[in-house]
Structures are given as C-alpha cells and as structure tokens.
Amino acid sequence: MSQNKIYDVAIIGAGPGALTAAIYTSRGNLDTVFIDNAAPGGKLIYASKIENWPGDTIVKGTDLAIRFFEHAQAFGAKYEYGKVVDLINIKDDLKELVLEDGKKIQAKSVIIASGMVSRKPREILNYDEFENRGVSYCVICDGPMYGHNPAIIIGGGNSAVEEGTFLSSIASKVYVIVRDSDFIAEKALVNDLKSRKNIEVLFNASVKELHGKDALEYAIVNHNGKEVKLEVASLFPYIGFLPSAEYAKNAGVLEPNGFIKTDEFMETKVPGIYAIGDIRIKDIRQILTATSDGTIAGKILTNRIKK
C-alpha cells in the first residue's frame, strides 16, 4: 500500500460491525480498507456455536466469520494486517492511522470498530507466568492442544458457560469456577452445560494461585472459604472485557472509561470519525447490534462522501 493513497474509509477492526460497514461502503463504491492484527471475525472466531443469528438455527462462529470476511472482500474492500497504534485527526476530511510497523494509512473518514479485549485476572498468583503455558483465552483455538487433561473455566456469564460446554468435549474434566452463588448466563446455555457429565461447577469460588514446573500443573481454588487443589493443564478466564481503543486517545474521541460516545449516526464528537460495535457506549452488545451499527455507519458514509 502506498502511503500517498487516500482511502475514502479506513475501518479499524475486522469483527461483525467492521465487516458489515465494509460491505456497505465498498458496495457503495467507496474506496475502503479495514485493518486488524487478528484473524478476521473478531469474537466470532471464539464462538463454538451461535444460536441467535437470524437464518441459522446454529452456526459455527468461524464459519460466520469467513462468510462476513468474504462478503466484504467481494465488493472490493481491502484487508490490511496490522496493529493501529495512533489515530491522528489531521482535519475534518483527512485522518491518518499509524501502524505498529511505522506504516501510515490516510483516509477521509475512519470507523473505529476495535471492540474489547478479555479482562485478565492478574490478582491470581503466578498468573502472568503461565500465559501461553496453560493460561489461554480461546477454547476453540487452544483447547485441543491441552489434550484430554482437566481444565478450568472462570466465569458465570454466557461466554464462560458456552466455552465450558464446548471444552467438555475435549477435556476429561472441566471445572467451572463461579465467583457468585449462581450463573448470570442464559438459562438455555446453563441447562446445556449442566447436562455434561464431566463438568463440575464450583459456586462461591475463586482461583488464588497457579503452579507448575514448565507448564500449568495445578491451581489453588478458594471454595466456600476452603482451599482446594485442582490438578489441571489449562485455564480459560471469561470474566468480562475492557475497551480496546487506546490508539484513539490523541484523536479526542475517548471517554474517561475508554469507550466512545456517538450520535444516532455512529459519528463521534470529532467530524469524520465514527465508532461502532462493542467500543461504543451502549447497553446491549451482540453480533446483531454490531452489524446494525456497521450498517448505519456504512450507509451514512456512503451518502456523505461524494465520489
């Protein structure tokens, strides 16, 4: 990519919202590029199954991600692999993205769609030492590499329950550690998890320590005030997410909590910069709401940018 080229639209991210926006802008004949440093699809690639996408009773997250990605490219949107580290608001109709490798991408408008990243339970003793040596964040991606060894899932929400259920088809035993006295996940998901014979749920529990020589071998868990030793080879935390748009701090669009406020057209307080998906301040974060955001931003930009 030439650094002298100016795109009509640059989209930061490659999740459902980003790819939907790319479909609309490229289909509207806007020169579009989307940038991400992970596999296209965003959190879709971590979902073993999706049951609330209209038209598909059940669909694998990876399959849906591929369909989104191919659809966006079919109309000419270009994919750039890279990590955005700075967003510069040069003027209302010119923005510059700086990538980690020093490359710069300029565009008339920018859509921020970088979503959120997993929250890490760093209060667990030795947690950092076992990242990538037992601690992982994607059951679908990494679960198989730990074989049939017992595993821990931390969390009581939808993601924890879904991934725990999926992991039970790989690991010989799955311990689901829930801080509270009950799940907050949807009932249908909880019922599916409870039907698995090799899943044990520990309520009112928290992981305190991780131990092992070269890789994770066991965890110390506080359960109802008593310490329990669980011999496991892997641990997957699903305890919430944090906003992922630090690169936009110099552009003046971030709120104190790290999220971004927009109007009904997905535009931020800075002209020409839009935000969609999970990074927006909103109450409901779902695949459908992200695609809705992407649709709105894509249509608005198609109408506003004159070719």
Curated annotation (Swiss-Prot):
Q: Which Pfam families match?
A: Pyr_redox_2 (PF07992)
Q: Which Gene3D superfamilies match?
A: FAD/NAD(P)-binding domain (3.50.50.60)
User: What keywords appear on the UniProt entry?
Assistant: Cytoplasm, Disulfide bond, FAD, Flavoprotein, NADP, Oxidoreductase, Redox-active center
Q: Which InterPro entries match?
A: FAD/NAD-bd_sf (IPR036188), FAD/NAD-binding_dom (IPR023753), Ferredoxin-NADP_redctase_2 (IPR050097), Pyr_nucl-diS_OxRdtase_2_AS (IPR008255)
Q: Name one GO cellular component term.
A: cytoplasm
Cofactor(s) needed by this chain: FAD
Could you tell me which cysteines form disulfide bridges?
138-141
- Residues making up the signal peptide according to the UniProt record: none
Record text on cofactor binding? Binds 1 FAD per subunit.
SUPFAM superfamilies named among the record's database cross-references: FAD/NAD(P)-binding domain
Q: Family, per the entry? A: Belongs to the class-II pyridine nucleotide-disulfide oxidoreductase family.
Q: What subunit structure does UniProt give?
A: Homodimer.
Name this protein carries in UniProt: Thioredoxin reductase
Top-level taxonomy: Bacteria, Bacillati, Mycoplasmatota, Mycoplasmoidales, Metamycoplasmataceae
Provide the gene name from the record: trxB
